[in-house]
Structure formats: structure tokens, C-alpha cells
């Protein structure tokens, strides 16, 4: 994250600096990408250890970075994100919050209450977002978020940005990877491959649990960062809206920091 912020401040980056910035943003998503990779390899019966493939992928990425020209300026055209698409991204995010995310996060906050309370709340909430109309809509909204979000990332990283905008971009990269991986874990891995319910046992990694199992331990940063960054990303979007509507940048920046701090304490 810090490397991406530093590189994003360069006005006229070289080809190597631009590639390094984008690679640093991708590295922010490393915890969720590693989980995604592990799930996919598990369904393929682990043809190679996930750690080996993981190291190989980053070694290739590093080799590509080292081959980049650090003298020639990056040949990219700085183009703005279309306003209608940006508005659609925000509106669809708000729809997801109202239809699904608020209930889903509230459900997960029931973990300290124990399995019985968690499952009882899950059953109630699933009547809302798992019906034949809303569930396909939720999936479509998530895919729209991922597609438009990655398009924004590519456009926005072609231009310099301050640390607050870079944080918004980085959190978006993480969430795009997380959403794709989470939908794969739920719809393909759990419901199709294992044919199990995605309730308490699935969420907590039972019977081994998350802490003591060498595979499940990766789920802790995977889930915690998702919770932190989804709330922080919403705060980042609110910051942009406030600045657009005349709120002072300093105040909007402070409100984003406050939102991120609050998200980190959940």
C-alpha cells in the first residue's frame, strides 16, 4: 500500500514506475488472491502445492518488472472515467449495501454470540437475499462492481493521484479479487463441488478451525481485510462525493480517515 502511494505521486512515471505502481496495487490483494488460488487448486486435487505456484507467479511478475524500461516515459493516454459509469458504480454499490452487505456483515458480527444465534440470524437474512429474484440481482451487481471497478483502476493508475485516491484504488483492487474469489468459494466450491451449506461450519473452518489449521489460517487476513476495506472503500467513495459537492478537501480527508479507523475497530 505504501509503495503504491509513493509511486502514485510521480507526475511523469517511467514505464517501469507505472508497472511497479500497478504491481504494488495488485500486491495489496495478495491475501485474498492466495486464498482464491488455494481454493481453485483444491478443486483440481492439488496438482502442485499452492505455495510453489504462488511463489512462481510473483517471481514471474518480478521478472517482468525488472525488464521494464526505467528511462523511457510510460506510453499511456490519461483518460477520464466516464461520469455516467462512475455514478452507476456508486448506485450499484448503494444497492448492494441495502440488499445484501448490511445484512451479511450484521450476520457475521453475530459470531461472538455462538453457533446457535449465528445460524438463527442467517436463516432470517437468507429469506431476503437468497430468494429467486434478489440472489441473481446480487450476483449481477457484484459482477458489475468488479468489472467497472477494474476498468476504473486501469484508467486511474495512468495518472498521478494523492494518497487518499490511491487508498481508494487499492481497496477497490482488493475487493474485486475478494468478490470473485468469494463467489467462487460459495457458488462453485461449497454449493457445487462439496455440496455443503455455507453456514457456521463453512465460515469458521470447522472442525479444524482457523487458527490451528495450516490452510485455514490464511482466511483470517482474507476476511478481516475484506471487512476493513469494504467499509473504507465506501468511506472513500463518500469522500469523492463530498468534494464534488463542495465540501472542503481537508474535511473530506479527515472523515475518510475517521471512517477507516472505525472500520478497523469492527
What are these model-derived regions, one by one?
Residues 1-266:
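Membrane-embedded alpha-helical bundles that constitute the cytochrome b-like, heme-associated redox core
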Amino acid at each position: 500500500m505504501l509503495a503504491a502511494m509513493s509511486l502514485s505521486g510521480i507526475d511523469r512515471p517511467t514505464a517501469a514506475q507505472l508497472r511497479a505502481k500497478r504491481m504494488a496495487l495488485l500486491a495489496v490483494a495478495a491475501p485474498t488472491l492466495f486464498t482464491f488460488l488455494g481454493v481453485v487448486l483444491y478443486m483440481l486435487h492439488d496438482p502442485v502445492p499452492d505455495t510453489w505456484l504462488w511463489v512462481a507467479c510473483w517471481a514471474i511478475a518480478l521478472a517482468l518488472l525488472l525488464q521494464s524500461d526505467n528511462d523511457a516515459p510510460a506510453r499511456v493516454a490519461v483518460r477520464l472515467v466516464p461520469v455516467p459509469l462512475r455514478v452507476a458504480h456508486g448506485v450499484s454499490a448503494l444497492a448492494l449495501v441495502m440488499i445484501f452487505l448490511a445484512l451479511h456483515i450484521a450476520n457475521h458480527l453475530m459470531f461472538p454470540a455462538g453457533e446457535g444465534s449465528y445460524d438463527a440470524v442467517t436463516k432470517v437474512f437468507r429469506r431476503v437475499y437468497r430468494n429467486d429474484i434478489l440472489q441473481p440481482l446480487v450476483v449481477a451487481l457484484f459482477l458489475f462492481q468488479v468489472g467497472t471497478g477494474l476498468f476504473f483502476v486501469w484508467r486511474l493508475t495512468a495518472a498521478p493521484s494523492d494518497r487518499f485516491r490511491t487508498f481508494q484504488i487499492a481497496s477497490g483492487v482488493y475487493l474485486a479479487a475478494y468478490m470473485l474469489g468469494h463467489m467462487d468459494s460459495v457458488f462453485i466450491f461449497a454449493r457445487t463441488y462439496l455440496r455443503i451449506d455455507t453456514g457456521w461450519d463453512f465460515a469458521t473452518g470447522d472442525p479444524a478451525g482457523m487458527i490451528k489449521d495450516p490452510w485455514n489460517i490464511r482466511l483470517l487476513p482474507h476476511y478481516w481485510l475484506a471487512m476493513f476495506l469494504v467499509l473504507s472503500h465506501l468511506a472513500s467513495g463518500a469522500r469523492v462525493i463530498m468534494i464534488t459537492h463542495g465540501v472542503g478537501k481537508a474535511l473530506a480527508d479527515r472523515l475518510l480517515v475517521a471512517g477507516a479507523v472505525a472500520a478497523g475497530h469492527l
